[in-house]
From Swiss-Prot:
Gene3D superfamilies linked to this entry: 6.10.280.130, Cytochrome c-like domain (1.10.760.10)
Subunit structure: Component of the cbb3-type cytochrome c oxidase at least composed of CcoN, CcoO, CcoQ and CcoP.
Cofactor: binding comment: Binds 2 heme C groups per subunit.
Gene coding for it: ccoP
PANTHER family linked: CBB3-TYPE CYTOCHROME C OXIDASE SUBUNIT FIXP
GO biological process: oxidative phosphorylation; proton transmembrane transport
Assigned keywords, A-Z: Cell inner membrane, Cell membrane, Electron transport, Heme, Hydrogen ion transport, Ion transport, Iron, Membrane, Metal-binding, Oxidoreductase, Repeat, Respiratory chain, Transmembrane, Transmembrane helix, Transport
UniProt name for this protein: Cbb3-type cytochrome c oxidase subunit CcoP
Bilayer disposition of the protein: Single-pass membrane protein
Binding positions (heme c 1): 121, 124-125, 269
Cellular localization per UniProt: Cell inner membrane
Native species: Azospirillum brasilense
Listed GO MF terms: electron transfer activity; heme binding; iron ion binding; oxidoreductase activity
Predominant localisation class: membrane
Pathway: Energy metabolism; oxidative phosphorylation
Amino acid sequence: MAQKEKDALSGVETTGHEWDGLRELNNPLPKWWLYIFYVCIAWSLVYYVLYPAWPLGKSYTKGLLGYSQREELVQKVADGKKAQEKYLTAIAATSVEDIQKNKDLLAFAMAGGRSYFNENCAACHGAGGQGAKGFPTLADDVWLWGGTTADIYKTIQHGIRADDGDTRGTVGIGMTAFGRDGILNRDQIGQVAEYILSLNKRSTDAAAAEKGKTVYDENCAACHGENAQGSLAVGMEVGAPPLVTGNWLYGGDKATLVQTITNGRAGVMPAWSKRLDDATIKSLAVYVHNLGGGK
Protein backbone atom coordinates (compact mmCIF):
# COMPACT_ATOMS: atom_id res chain seq x y z
CA MET A 1 0.00 0.00 0.00
CA ALA A 2 1.43 3.37 -1.01
CA GLN A 3 2.41 5.73 1.75
CA LYS A 4 0.32 8.91 1.72
CA GLU A 5 2.45 11.98 1.60
CA LYS A 6 1.72 14.94 3.84
CA ASP A 7 2.85 18.51 3.57
CA ALA A 8 5.35 19.17 6.33
CA LEU A 9 4.18 22.72 6.98
CA SER A 10 0.37 22.30 6.99
CA GLY A 11 0.09 18.61 7.76
CA VAL A 12 -2.40 18.19 4.87
CA GLU A 13 -2.14 15.24 2.53
CA THR A 14 -0.92 16.02 -0.97
CA THR A 15 -2.28 14.63 -4.22
CA GLY A 16 1.11 13.25 -5.10
CA HIS A 17 1.51 15.74 -7.92
CA GLU A 18 4.49 18.03 -8.06
CA TRP A 19 5.43 20.81 -10.48
CA ASP A 20 8.77 22.54 -10.16
CA GLY A 21 8.88 21.68 -6.48
CA LEU A 22 5.30 22.77 -5.83
CA ARG A 23 2.95 20.17 -4.39
CA GLU A 24 -0.86 20.24 -4.62
CA LEU A 25 -2.64 19.88 -1.28
CA ASN A 26 -5.66 17.60 -1.08
CA ASN A 27 -7.93 19.94 0.90
CA PRO A 28 -11.61 18.95 1.06
CA LEU A 29 -14.21 21.15 -0.64
CA PRO A 30 -15.88 23.78 1.56
CA LYS A 31 -19.05 22.47 3.19
CA TRP A 32 -21.15 25.36 1.90
CA TRP A 33 -20.09 24.49 -1.65
CA LEU A 34 -20.95 20.81 -1.14
CA TYR A 35 -24.37 21.66 0.29
CA ILE A 36 -25.19 23.84 -2.73
CA PHE A 37 -23.96 21.10 -5.04
CA TYR A 38 -26.18 18.50 -3.37
CA VAL A 39 -29.19 20.84 -3.50
CA CYS A 40 -28.60 21.36 -7.24
CA ILE A 41 -28.53 17.61 -7.78
CA ALA A 42 -31.75 17.18 -5.81
CA TRP A 43 -33.38 20.06 -7.71
CA SER A 44 -32.38 18.56 -11.06
CA LEU A 45 -33.96 15.24 -10.12
CA VAL A 46 -37.19 17.00 -9.11
CA TYR A 47 -37.08 19.01 -12.35
CA TYR A 48 -36.67 15.85 -14.44
CA VAL A 49 -39.79 14.42 -12.82
CA LEU A 50 -41.99 17.54 -12.98
CA TYR A 51 -40.99 19.14 -16.32
CA PRO A 52 -40.17 18.02 -19.88
CA ALA A 53 -36.61 16.77 -19.79
CA TRP A 54 -35.43 13.85 -21.93
CA PRO A 55 -35.82 13.36 -25.68
CA LEU A 56 -37.43 10.09 -26.72
CA GLY A 57 -37.04 9.70 -30.48
CA LYS A 58 -39.55 12.17 -31.95
CA SER A 59 -41.11 12.84 -28.56
CA TYR A 60 -39.89 13.63 -25.04
CA THR A 61 -40.77 13.01 -21.40
CA LYS A 62 -43.73 15.29 -20.60
CA GLY A 63 -43.21 15.60 -16.84
CA LEU A 64 -45.88 15.30 -14.15
CA LEU A 65 -46.94 18.96 -14.54
CA GLY A 66 -47.50 18.61 -18.29
CA TYR A 67 -45.89 22.03 -18.88
CA SER A 68 -45.04 23.12 -22.44
CA GLN A 69 -43.42 26.40 -23.50
CA ARG A 70 -44.82 25.93 -26.99
CA GLU A 71 -48.36 25.65 -25.65
CA GLU A 72 -47.76 28.64 -23.40
CA LEU A 73 -46.58 30.68 -26.40
CA VAL A 74 -49.60 29.64 -28.47
CA GLN A 75 -51.89 30.63 -25.61
CA LYS A 76 -50.21 34.01 -25.13
CA VAL A 77 -50.46 34.76 -28.85
CA ALA A 78 -54.14 33.79 -28.80
CA ASP A 79 -54.74 36.01 -25.76
CA GLY A 80 -52.98 38.90 -27.49
CA LYS A 81 -55.06 38.50 -30.64
CA LYS A 82 -58.22 38.34 -28.56
CA ALA A 83 -57.29 41.58 -26.79
CA GLN A 84 -56.68 43.26 -30.17
CA GLU A 85 -59.80 41.89 -31.82
CA LYS A 86 -62.20 44.54 -30.53
CA TYR A 87 -59.97 47.32 -31.85
CA LEU A 88 -59.37 45.64 -35.21
CA THR A 89 -63.10 45.04 -35.63
CA ALA A 90 -63.84 48.67 -34.76
CA ILE A 91 -61.19 49.97 -37.17
CA ALA A 92 -62.51 47.77 -39.99
CA ALA A 93 -66.00 49.19 -39.41
CA THR A 94 -64.87 52.84 -39.13
CA SER A 95 -63.83 55.22 -41.89
CA VAL A 96 -60.24 56.45 -41.87
CA GLU A 97 -61.47 59.99 -41.20
CA ASP A 98 -63.45 58.91 -38.13
CA ILE A 99 -60.56 56.83 -36.79
CA GLN A 100 -58.64 60.10 -36.46
CA LYS A 101 -61.44 61.47 -34.26
CA ASN A 102 -61.49 58.52 -31.85
CA LYS A 103 -58.68 58.75 -29.30
CA ASP A 104 -58.51 55.02 -28.53
CA LEU A 105 -58.75 53.88 -32.15
CA LEU A 106 -56.20 56.49 -33.23
CA ALA A 107 -53.69 55.31 -30.62
CA PHE A 108 -54.18 51.66 -31.61
CA ALA A 109 -53.99 52.45 -35.35
CA MET A 110 -50.79 54.48 -34.89
CA ALA A 111 -49.10 51.71 -32.90
CA GLY A 112 -50.15 49.03 -35.36
CA GLY A 113 -49.51 51.24 -38.37
CA ARG A 114 -45.92 51.82 -37.34
CA SER A 115 -45.30 48.08 -37.11
CA TYR A 116 -47.04 47.40 -40.44
CA PHE A 117 -45.10 50.26 -42.07
CA ASN A 118 -41.73 48.93 -40.92
CA GLU A 119 -42.66 45.47 -42.16
CA ASN A 120 -44.12 46.38 -45.56
CA CYS A 121 -43.25 49.96 -46.56
CA ALA A 122 -39.95 51.03 -45.00
CA ALA A 123 -37.85 49.06 -47.50
CA CYS A 124 -38.81 51.57 -50.21
CA HIS A 125 -39.99 54.68 -48.36
CA GLY A 126 -37.53 54.57 -45.45
CA ALA A 127 -38.17 53.87 -41.77
CA GLY A 128 -39.23 57.46 -41.16
CA GLY A 129 -40.98 57.96 -44.49
CA GLN A 130 -38.03 60.00 -45.79
CA GLY A 131 -38.19 58.33 -49.19
CA ALA A 132 -35.39 57.51 -51.62
CA LYS A 133 -34.62 57.96 -55.30
CA GLY A 134 -37.73 56.82 -57.15
CA PHE A 135 -39.73 56.41 -53.93
CA PRO A 136 -41.59 59.51 -52.68
CA THR A 137 -41.13 61.06 -49.27
CA LEU A 138 -44.16 60.53 -47.04
CA ALA A 139 -43.16 62.92 -44.28
CA ASP A 140 -43.54 66.19 -46.22
CA ASP A 141 -46.58 67.97 -47.64
CA VAL A 142 -45.93 67.20 -51.32
CA TRP A 143 -48.31 64.52 -52.60
CA LEU A 144 -48.59 63.07 -56.09
CA TRP A 145 -51.94 61.36 -55.54
CA GLY A 146 -53.39 63.32 -52.63
CA GLY A 147 -52.46 63.63 -48.98
CA THR A 148 -55.78 63.28 -47.17
CA THR A 149 -56.31 60.16 -45.09
CA ALA A 150 -58.84 58.92 -47.65
CA ASP A 151 -56.39 59.53 -50.52
CA ILE A 152 -53.61 57.67 -48.74
CA TYR A 153 -55.96 54.80 -47.89
CA LYS A 154 -56.98 54.50 -51.55
CA THR A 155 -53.37 54.60 -52.73
CA ILE A 156 -52.28 51.84 -50.34
CA GLN A 157 -55.33 49.75 -51.11
CA HIS A 158 -55.20 49.88 -54.91
CA GLY A 159 -51.60 50.87 -55.62
CA ILE A 160 -50.13 53.00 -58.41
CA ARG A 161 -50.26 51.57 -61.93
CA ALA A 162 -50.72 48.18 -60.28
CA ASP A 163 -52.51 45.01 -61.27
CA ASP A 164 -55.77 46.17 -59.71
CA GLY A 165 -58.99 47.25 -61.36
CA ASP A 166 -59.19 50.40 -59.23
CA THR A 167 -55.49 51.27 -59.28
CA ARG A 168 -54.47 54.91 -59.46
CA GLY A 169 -53.07 55.82 -62.85
CA THR A 170 -52.98 53.46 -65.81
CA VAL A 171 -50.91 50.29 -65.89
CA GLY A 172 -47.90 50.73 -68.17
CA ILE A 173 -48.60 54.41 -68.84
CA GLY A 174 -46.63 57.12 -67.08
CA MET A 175 -44.79 60.22 -68.18
CA THR A 176 -44.22 60.48 -71.92
CA ALA A 177 -40.69 59.76 -73.15
CA PHE A 178 -40.39 62.99 -75.12
CA GLY A 179 -36.91 62.29 -76.46
CA ARG A 180 -37.11 58.55 -76.99
CA ASP A 181 -40.45 58.89 -78.78
CA GLY A 182 -39.15 61.70 -81.01
CA ILE A 183 -41.57 64.36 -79.73
CA LEU A 184 -38.82 66.79 -78.72
CA ASN A 185 -35.29 67.12 -80.04
CA ARG A 186 -32.18 67.41 -77.89
CA ASP A 187 -32.13 71.22 -77.95
CA GLN A 188 -35.78 71.47 -76.90
CA ILE A 189 -35.22 69.02 -74.05
CA GLY A 190 -32.27 71.07 -72.81
CA GLN A 191 -34.35 74.25 -73.06
CA VAL A 192 -37.29 72.90 -71.08
CA ALA A 193 -34.85 71.55 -68.47
CA GLU A 194 -33.40 75.07 -68.16
CA TYR A 195 -36.92 76.46 -67.78
CA ILE A 196 -37.67 74.06 -64.93
CA LEU A 197 -34.37 75.06 -63.29
CA SER A 198 -35.36 78.72 -63.68
CA LEU A 199 -38.60 78.05 -61.79
CA ASN A 200 -36.37 76.97 -58.91
CA LYS A 201 -33.96 79.89 -59.41
CA ARG A 202 -31.14 77.61 -60.55
CA SER A 203 -30.96 78.27 -64.29
CA THR A 204 -27.63 79.30 -65.80
CA ASP A 205 -28.95 80.04 -69.31
CA ALA A 206 -31.72 82.64 -69.37
CA ALA A 207 -32.12 82.52 -73.16
CA ALA A 208 -32.59 78.74 -73.17
CA ALA A 209 -35.00 79.00 -70.23
CA GLU A 210 -37.12 81.52 -72.13
CA LYS A 211 -37.37 79.17 -75.13
CA GLY A 212 -38.03 76.31 -72.74
CA LYS A 213 -41.14 78.05 -71.42
CA THR A 214 -42.74 77.78 -74.83
CA VAL A 215 -41.79 74.10 -75.06
CA TYR A 216 -43.18 73.56 -71.56
CA ASP A 217 -46.49 75.28 -72.28
CA GLU A 218 -47.00 73.19 -75.41
CA ASN A 219 -45.96 69.81 -74.02
CA CYS A 220 -45.85 69.73 -70.21
CA ALA A 221 -48.42 72.15 -68.82
CA ALA A 222 -51.34 69.83 -69.59
CA CYS A 223 -50.22 67.51 -66.78
CA HIS A 224 -47.96 69.60 -64.56
CA GLY A 225 -50.05 72.78 -64.76
CA GLU A 226 -49.32 76.17 -66.29
CA ASN A 227 -47.43 77.22 -63.17
CA ALA A 228 -45.84 73.78 -62.67
CA GLN A 229 -47.85 73.20 -59.49
CA GLY A 230 -48.51 69.56 -60.33
CA SER A 231 -51.53 67.62 -61.57
CA LEU A 232 -53.43 67.81 -58.27
CA ALA A 233 -53.38 71.60 -58.47
CA VAL A 234 -55.16 71.49 -61.84
CA GLY A 235 -57.68 68.85 -60.76
CA MET A 236 -56.11 65.89 -62.56
CA GLU A 237 -55.24 62.49 -61.11
CA VAL A 238 -52.22 61.48 -63.18
CA GLY A 239 -49.47 61.69 -60.57
CA ALA A 240 -47.57 64.54 -62.26
CA PRO A 241 -45.45 66.14 -59.50
CA PRO A 242 -45.09 69.86 -58.85
CA LEU A 243 -41.85 71.21 -60.30
CA VAL A 244 -41.44 74.29 -58.09
CA THR A 245 -41.18 72.84 -54.58
CA GLY A 246 -37.59 71.63 -54.62
CA ASN A 247 -38.79 68.08 -53.92
CA TRP A 248 -37.49 65.73 -56.59
CA LEU A 249 -38.37 62.07 -56.91
CA TYR A 250 -35.46 61.22 -59.22
CA GLY A 251 -33.25 64.30 -58.89
CA GLY A 252 -33.42 67.99 -59.78
CA ASP A 253 -30.06 68.60 -61.44
CA LYS A 254 -30.02 69.35 -65.16
CA ALA A 255 -28.61 65.98 -66.20
CA THR A 256 -31.35 64.11 -64.34
CA LEU A 257 -34.06 66.44 -65.67
CA VAL A 258 -32.83 65.82 -69.22
CA GLN A 259 -32.85 62.08 -68.59
CA THR A 260 -36.39 62.25 -67.16
CA ILE A 261 -37.74 64.31 -70.06
CA THR A 262 -35.99 62.10 -72.61
CA ASN A 263 -37.07 58.69 -71.29
CA GLY A 264 -40.09 59.48 -69.11
CA ARG A 265 -40.96 57.97 -65.73
CA ALA A 266 -43.63 55.47 -64.69
CA GLY A 267 -43.36 54.60 -61.01
CA VAL A 268 -45.29 51.59 -59.74
CA MET A 269 -46.59 50.70 -56.28
CA PRO A 270 -48.28 47.36 -55.48
CA ALA A 271 -51.94 47.13 -54.52
CA TRP A 272 -51.68 46.08 -50.88
CA SER A 273 -55.30 44.95 -50.65
CA LYS A 274 -54.10 41.64 -52.10
CA ARG A 275 -51.83 41.08 -49.11
CA LEU A 276 -53.16 43.12 -46.18
CA ASP A 277 -56.63 43.20 -44.65
CA ASP A 278 -58.72 46.36 -44.49
CA ALA A 279 -57.99 47.14 -40.83
CA THR A 280 -54.25 46.95 -41.52
CA ILE A 281 -54.50 49.24 -44.54
CA LYS A 282 -56.54 51.77 -42.56
CA SER A 283 -53.96 51.70 -39.76
CA LEU A 284 -51.23 52.30 -42.34
CA ALA A 285 -53.15 55.21 -43.86
CA VAL A 286 -53.59 56.83 -40.46
CA TYR A 287 -49.92 56.31 -39.60
CA VAL A 288 -48.63 57.73 -42.90
CA HIS A 289 -51.00 60.69 -42.62
CA ASN A 290 -49.51 61.48 -39.22
CA LEU A 291 -45.88 61.26 -40.31
CA GLY A 292 -46.01 65.02 -40.73
CA GLY A 293 -47.31 65.92 -44.17
CA GLY A 294 -50.93 64.76 -44.20
CA LYS A 295 -53.50 67.16 -45.59
